[in-house]
């Protein structure tokens, strides 16, 4: 609260005129972040609609990495949090999920988004080298490739990912994982496991 007060050029105690405590401030910040998630109009294709919704959640969490820690750590009662939860629940219910299956699907897809953002965080925030210079990154890449040379599968994998733009690679990984996750949920629906 002291740092926030200093940033606002006021005392830490002035912040308490607006919020009761740090937890309330975090709740408000989380709800404001969730306001950034666009709720797409339903198209009738629950998978496509859920992909769009979760893509928005991923974009928001990538822009505000601190939200991944807060998402399930406290109840979210703000209007934007409730709006988001309602949209996701409606999509899953329209697909046929109910009861424990609805709860599992709801939390699993959000946990997947949180995990993908957390896993990508260090790759986004840290350059390949401490200096961040292109020449140092290239030297590090060459060293990693040399270290992989005795291992054919690893060498081929490193060559493949080296050819991709980092953000594009992270997006492809997210899309692949989400597709597999939705395939599994679809299979459960087909098998009638949603009681």
Predicted regions and their residues:
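Helix-turn-helix
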Residues: 1-24
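Short, Lys/Arg-enriched C-terminal cap helix and immediately downstream tail that follows
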Residues: 26-28
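Amphipathic alpha-helical segments used for helix-helix packing
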Residues: 30, 58-79, 87, 118, ...
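C-terminal peripheral helix-coil segments that are non-catalytic and often amphipathic
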Residues: 122-195
């Amino acid at each position: 609260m002291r740092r926030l007060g200093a940033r606002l050029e006021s005392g830490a105690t002035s912040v308490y005129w607006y919020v009761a405590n740090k937890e309330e401030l975090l709740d408000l910040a989380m709800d404001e972040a969730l306001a950034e998630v666009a709720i797409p109009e339903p198209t009738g294709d629950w998978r496509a609609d859920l992909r769009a919704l979760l893509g928005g959640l991923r974009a928001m969490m990538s822009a505000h990495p601190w939200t991944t820690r807060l998402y399930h750590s406290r109840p979210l009662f703000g209007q934007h949090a409730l709006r988001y939860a309602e949209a996701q629940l409606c999509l899953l219910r329209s697909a046929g999920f109910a009861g424990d299956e609805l709860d599992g699907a709801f939390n699993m897809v959000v946990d997947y988004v949180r995990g993908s953002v957390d896993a990508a965080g260090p790759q986004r925030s840290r350059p390949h080298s401490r200096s961040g210079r292109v020449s140092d990154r290239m030297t590090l890449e060459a060293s990693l490739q040399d270290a992989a040379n005795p291992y054919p599968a690893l060498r081929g994998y490193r060559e493949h990912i080296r050819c991709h733009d980092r953000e594009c690679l992270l997006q492809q990984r997210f899309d692949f994982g989400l597709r597999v996750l939705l395939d599994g949920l679809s299979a459960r629906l087909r098998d009638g496991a949603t009681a």
